[in-house]
Amino acid sequence: MLKNYFFDVIIIGGGHAGTEAAVASAKIGCNTLLLTHNIKTIGEMSCNPAIGGIGKGHLAKEVDAMGGIMAKAIDAAGIQFRILNASKGPAVRATRAQADRYLYRKAVYNMLKNTNNLLVLQQFVENLIIKNNNVIGVISKAKDKFYANSVILTVGTFLDGKIHIGLNSYPGGRTGDLSSISLSSNLRKLPFRVKRLKTGTPPRIHASTVNFNILTKQESDNPLPVFSFTGSVSEHPRQIPCYITYTNKNTHDIIYNNLHYSPIYTKNIEGIGPRYCPSIEDKIIHFAHRDSHQIFLEPEGLMSNIIYPNGISTSLPVDIQLKIVQSIEGLEKASIIQPGYAIEYDFFDPRDLKNTLESKIINGLFFAGQINGTTGYEEAAAQGLIAGINAAKKVLEQDSWYPNRSQAYIGVLIDDLCLQGIEEPYRMFTSRAEYRLSLREDNADLRLTEIARKLGLVNENHWHKFCIKLDYIERERQRLRNLWVQPNTIGIQDLNQLLKKPIMCKINGEELLRRPEINYKTLTNLSFFQPTLKNIQAAEQIEIQIKYEGYIAQQQEQILRQLNYEQTLLPKNMDFSLVTGLSNEAISQLNNHQPYSIGQALRISGITPIAISLLLLWLKKNNLLANKINK
């Protein structure tokens, strides 16, 4: 039994947002309670068994740089690791790892279990306790009351979740789990803006019924990538391949001829689905010119007999799903273990949140994850981290913190959500970031770990490894600056063979590394520039910093110019009709979005440079131009 029911921070939900929030809050020093309906599903991968990808890998790396657990968990559970966009520039390169579902859950739970100040308890939460517009606790289904000064809602797809298969539907948070109907009903009594979204998942296939011999095999990269900045390849379990197959005309005909059984096309589902992860029904309608669609057959674990066919999410009836599966090459004799389904759930308009992810309506109440309209484990984890930090800081009466758009993809995510809101499930892409050359996977720790250390999120071991990496980078760059070669240097022909044009004057190692034909490894394999750094992360960072130095410097100038706008505050709850000269559209948009700064106002649709000039004039006239954000 609990000795008491009083905590500093309570988190409702043990998914990717909830676990990151719990760890962050506990690390900062708050007595933290994580409530979950089922301890066995903590860290569950409800949909595809993978972490990372374009934009998503950037988020996972940023969470890791700030002491989060997602990257460490996937390093312990990843059974196939790849770098996407490896042949492209560093801004869009992204790590992706296939996960063993069981090992991932185990890794997450073990990290929670070993976190000080954190208690994990199995309880189904039905209501919040609110007093004078402040949240002060929660009530469980068993009518137990748990009190705290900050509460974080990380409930995923469970709020009034409804599962659809064909024309049938039933309550559920995901297959095998109950829906949170009472909590949804009670939250809807509060003055929040609540809407519905939907997502879906494909049928799961029995591995022994798949003909892998005729399919394209996709192995892990060599050398194996590592997700966590403090991780190593030795932590990875055994690696196994994924396989690739395709839909065909027969597949598409089966789907098209049965659309009248689809809950999406019969309007049984009112929620909007994810644009960038469409169902197979949506694919054949919206991409009718395509003869086939790629499917990745992803193993769900080393000891699992289940295959996840990534690319055929569907909510058609089970018998139709089987026909679809068996129409695909390699799956002619496949059997389905679990049918695909669509799920509808409540989400709360994130424009009702501050950038700390605290509600503007109920003090001390924070929202993170799919409840804010995002899709994806990594987006949820990033929000959980920020909510956990700020829930704890609020309890401790310390300054809040969140990154801006120039600091992190997490900052882009939060700014997009809280300023623009969403009309469809939000997924992160590198294209969403205007400063993506500065926001790379490889430098997430250089951008965020020092901040995380000051916030209390990074332990001694993490900090020590980070400082060693910084030292390696500085020492090696200095060494390359001080190593010079000339046209008459003995053995210079070895270098000239690597260059489009032979060197004609004295040149140092840094200047040589700026040339497109030379990379760090080839340079330091030459006798004059040996030895090569053994620290792979530091070596990668040195090459990118030197090769892209000019472009990065230009972007930093842009960031500094924009930062002045970001730090110029607008009054809270401002009536923008007071600003002379603003168009009716601008007034409407500004009053609706209530930007907190000139920088945010700039990013609102319909707000022109002229409108910004008028706002700045109004601030100056009212002696408010000196108001700055101190962060």
UniProtKB/Swiss-Prot annotation:
Disulfide bonds: none
Keyword Cell division appears in the UniProt entry: no
SMART domains according to UniProt: GIDA_assoc_3
Alphabetically ordered keywords of this record: Cytoplasm, FAD, Flavoprotein, NAD, tRNA processing
Essential cofactor(s): FAD
Pfam family, one: SAM_GIDA_C
Cross-referenced NCBIfam families: mnmG_gidA
Protein name: tRNA uridine 5-carboxymethylaminomethyl modification enzyme MnmG
